[in-house]
Amino acid sequence: GPDYDDVGAMAVMHALADSGYVDILATISSNKSELTIPCIEIINTYFKRPDISLGVAKGESAVTLECPHNKKWTEVLPQKYTHRIAKSSDAPDAVKVYRSILCTQPDNSVTICTIGAFSNLKELLQSKGDEFSPETGVELVRRKVKQLVSMAGVFPEGREYNIYCDASSSSFVVSHWPTDIIFCGFEIGYNIITGRRVSRMPVENHPIKDVFLLCMSQGEPQGRWSWDQATVWVAIKGYTPYYISERGVISVDSEGNNTWRTTR
């Protein structure tokens, strides 16, 4: 959160899991808002996965973001639907969750998908050996992670929120991440609008419909851009046949501007 394309992204993730395309290991928030984890738990529970591991950013550089609408979906969902975790700060530390899960997975098997800030991943890379693994964060990621897929950046150059909201973490991650990163830039999801069919579904007590209906009624009747949904799709299904990709090197400066240099 707080953009409601996050809700759409979770719906895509769960739908693809229902179809057998992905095993969801955890849902981890880079947003320290106290409402984030209750909302994530509600969506996981609706899709019959109430026991998915949850984690939240605890680092000093992590952002706290709230929904910009007058009537906030992040307040409406926890009021309407039951949840076990009262507030985000009650959830486990994101880095601990990452490390505890990664150490149990086969080598080169995990895809990490980010649709927010890079704060948690910086903390993961900088982590030391612990009760879960003697390896450093970089060593653990290098051994266990297949790829990182991120909704971040504008290509070939620009300034995009998920990068500049914590520019120092973004710069660190893109410079030190030890596996391939696939970037789904702002320009991808900007050309995809979703929400109208979701908001008209003939169902009641459906948190995805509730969120889209509420937010679309506050100034976006056509629906919402789908930055995060597109990224989750690529993370799980790959970028073909809908997109093409090129290899290159990304750079992020202290103000959160990104540039791209194509390589062969």
Please provide the spans of the model-predicted regions.
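N-terminal acidic, glycine/proline-rich low-complexity segments
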Residues: 1-264
